[in-house]
UniProtKB/Swiss-Prot annotation:
Homomultimer. One of its GO terms (biological process) is protein transport. It is a multi-pass membrane protein. Disruption phenotype: Cells grow normally but accumulate a strongly reduced amount of toxins TcdA and TcdB in the medium. The chain crosses the membrane at residues 15-35, 36-56, 77-97, 111-131. Belongs to the bacteriophage holin family. GO terms for cellular component: plasma membrane. Pfam families: Phage_holin_4_1 (PF05105). InterPro entries: Phage_holin_4_1. One of its GO terms (molecular function) is pore-forming activity. This is Holin-like protein TcdE.
């Protein structure tokens, strides 16, 4: 048996097939540590959580159900990344065809797995949340960007009401 391989097949009279969870876990952790997009998801989630807590402290609006919902969403994002990284290890599917060539050239990508593709989507989502929390904390944000964030959030949530700020 090869402990470094996630699969073991016996070549005797019977063929045994099973997943060695330790091997899959080691490969997954190694995979996650090598991919910048996955590291960026964890970084943006952490930074957004910090800014969200600071925003709640500043506004004195601690809402445990809102915090729990946000925490569940962030844990689910990380769980999805772990799951999709296992899918990447097993399938080796390449999502580069979904990105414009300019982005591929700028990022110098040769391969984009499903976990990295969803990592990019999660990074974009968390980046909007970071900008929102920066505005709510009173940090300097360019006026045009702040207005666009307020309009976007007004259409999608009730967290930053753009009508109240005008």
């Amino acid at each position: 048996m090869h402990s470094s391989s996630p699969f073991y097949i016996s070549n005797g009279n019977k063929i045994f097939f099973y997943i060695n969870l330790g091997g899959v876990m080691n490969m997954t952790i190694s995979f996650l540590s090598e991919h910048i997009f996955i590291k960026l998801v964890i970084l943006t989630i952490s930074f957004d959580t910090l800014l969200g807590c600071l925003s709640a402290i500043k506004s004195r609006k601690f809402n445990s159900s809102f915090g729990i919902d946000g925490g569940i969403r962030k844990v689910a994002m990380i769980a999805c990344i772990f799951f999709l990284s296992v899918v990447d290890i097993l399938t080796k599917f390449n999502f580069l065809f979904m990105l414009p060539q300019d982005c591929i050239n700028f990022l110098r990508l040769k391969h984009l797995g499903i976990s990295e593709f969803f990592s990019i989507l999660f990074i974009l989502y968390e980046s909007v949340s970071i900008l929102k929390n920066m505005c709510l904390c009173g940090l300097p944000v360019p006026k045009r960007l702040k207005e666009k964030i307020a309009i976007l959030l007004d259409a999608m949530t009730d967290e930053m009401n753009a009508k109240d700020e005008k």
